[in-house]
């Protein structure tokens, strides 16, 4: 039942947020969804960095993929006889890309892959980095489809699920992480009902997740973030399924702000909590969530909705955009390498090494 062959990908996997045209990176502008489908054309690495920072492209896997193509674009501006020489000249562009969003480990991971292959490349270094950027995207899509099947297998038929933020095709190379599990669960008739939190302040759940599910013909119910505990108490959901921007060696998980409170509420109400992310999101070099840098964005993002100010002048705001869920509140971490139940340091080391 958990075989991915049971999934109609023509129906459940047709949205693509990134397209490499051969001379530019085209990004589906997620700031304008769902009412306008527009694209941002990036002709330089700086344009890619700005698109990442401004949330034109978002989602940990997607920004890693975008950064890979950003390196390819940066390479056009330099001359070098081999990869090692090119790497020295490209380092400023790599640093600018890495600084675009600090919390998601996939960004640094993708850039490290590009550094590694570049340093070992010869005269064909331009072709080498283009192949590596494409490989990062291809591997992410394959991982997402596999994780979808693994995660769906944990869900009893007839279950209701709640998700947070956007973890679908828009956040990845395709299919999605947590939303990939939901897509697979719907395709296999394991999931009976899907709820999505609106996800203030950027409303990724309201603007993106329910739109994605609508494109697939999946009926989803939007809730206010503050309604989640009441929903769990009602008995309508058996799983909370979320993505991740960084998973630490002990299982602590950084994800969109609001995830931590969902995990606390889920544990109180006996609702299971699943984190779905590719192994590139796992950071075994970070011992615990206390060591994660949490991105703080402009407080002005909290002052209004849809460009309309709703807050009086002179009000202060605090706007962290990620929080850390302790590993002991997580029932399962699903990666393409398998399922880690009740994650802790020993189980994480067994799956990913020290």
Curated annotation (Swiss-Prot):
Q: One GO biological process from the UniProt record?
A: L-methionine salvage from methylthioadenosine
What EC number(s) does this enzyme carry?
5.3.1.23
Does this entry carry the keyword Methyltransferase? no
SUPFAM superfamilies the record matches: NagB/RpiA/CoA transferase-like
User: Where do the catalytic residues lie?
Assistant: 245
Q: In which pathway does it act?
A: Amino-acid biosynthesis; L-methionine biosynthesis via salvage pathway; L-methionine from S-methyl-5-thio-alpha-D-ribose 1-phosphate: step 1/6
InterPro entries (UniProt xref):
IF-2B-related (IPR000649), IF-M1Pi (IPR005251), IF_2B-like_C (IPR042529), Initiation_fac_2B_a/b/d (IPR011559), M1Pi_N (IPR027363), NagB/RpiA_transferase-like (IPR037171)
Q: Where does substrate bind?
A: 58-60, 101, 204, 255-256
Q: Give the catalytic activity.
A: 5-(methylsulfanyl)-alpha-D-ribose 1-phosphate = 5-(methylsulfanyl)-D-ribulose 1-phosphate
**Which NCBIfam families does UniProt cross-reference here?**
eIF-2B_rel (TIGR00524), PRK05720.1 (NF004326), salvage_mtnA (TIGR00512)
Annotated protein name in UniProt: Methylthioribose-1-phosphate isomerase
Q: Which organism is it from?
A: Xanthomonas euvesicatoria pv. vesicatoria (strain 85-10)
């Amino acid at each position: 039942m958990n075989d991915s062959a049971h999934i109609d990908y023509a129906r459940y996997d047709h949205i693509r947020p990134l397209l490499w045209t051969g001379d530019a990176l085209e990004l589906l502008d997620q700031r304008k969804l769902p009412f306008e489908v527009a694209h941002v054309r990036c002709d330089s690495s700086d344009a890619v960095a700005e698109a990442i920072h401004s949330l034109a492209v978002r989602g940990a896997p997607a920004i890693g993929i975008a950064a890979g193509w950003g390196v390819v674009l940066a390479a056009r501006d330099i001359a070098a006889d081999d990869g090692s020489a090119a790497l020295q000249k490209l380092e400023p562009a790599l640093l600018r890309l890495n600084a675009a969003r600090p919390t998601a480990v996939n960004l640094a991971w993708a850039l490290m892959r590009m550094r590694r292959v570049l340093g070992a490349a010869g005269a064909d270094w331009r072709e080498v980095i283009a192949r590596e950027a494409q490989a990062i995207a291809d591997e992410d899509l394959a991982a997402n489809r596999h994780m979808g099947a693994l995660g769906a297998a944990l869900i009893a038929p007839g279950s209701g699920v709640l998700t947070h933020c956007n973890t679908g095709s828009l956040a990845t190379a395709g299919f999605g992480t947590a939303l990939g599990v939901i897509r697979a669960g719907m395709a296999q008739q394991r999931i009976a009902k899907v709820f999505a939190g609106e996800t203030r302040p950027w409303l990724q759940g309201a603007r993106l997740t329910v739109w994605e599910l609508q494109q697939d013909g999946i009926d989803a119910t939007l809730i206010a973030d503050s309604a989640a505990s009441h929903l769990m108490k009602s008995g309508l959901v058996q799983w909370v399924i979320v993505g991740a921007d960084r998973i630490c060696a002990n299982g602590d998980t950084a994800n969109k702000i609001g995830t931590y409170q969902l995990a606390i509420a889920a544990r109180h109400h006996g609702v299971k909590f699943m984190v779905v992310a590719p192994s590139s999101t796992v950071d075994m070099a970070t011992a615990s969530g206390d060591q994660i840098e949490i991105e703080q964005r402009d407080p002005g993002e909290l002052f209004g909705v849809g460009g309309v100010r709703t807050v009086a002048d002179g009000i202060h705001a605090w706007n962290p955009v990620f929080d850390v869920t302790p590993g002991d509140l997580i029932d399962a971490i699903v990666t393409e390498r398998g399922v880690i139940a009740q994650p802790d340091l020993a189980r994480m080391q067994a799956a990913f090494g020290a």
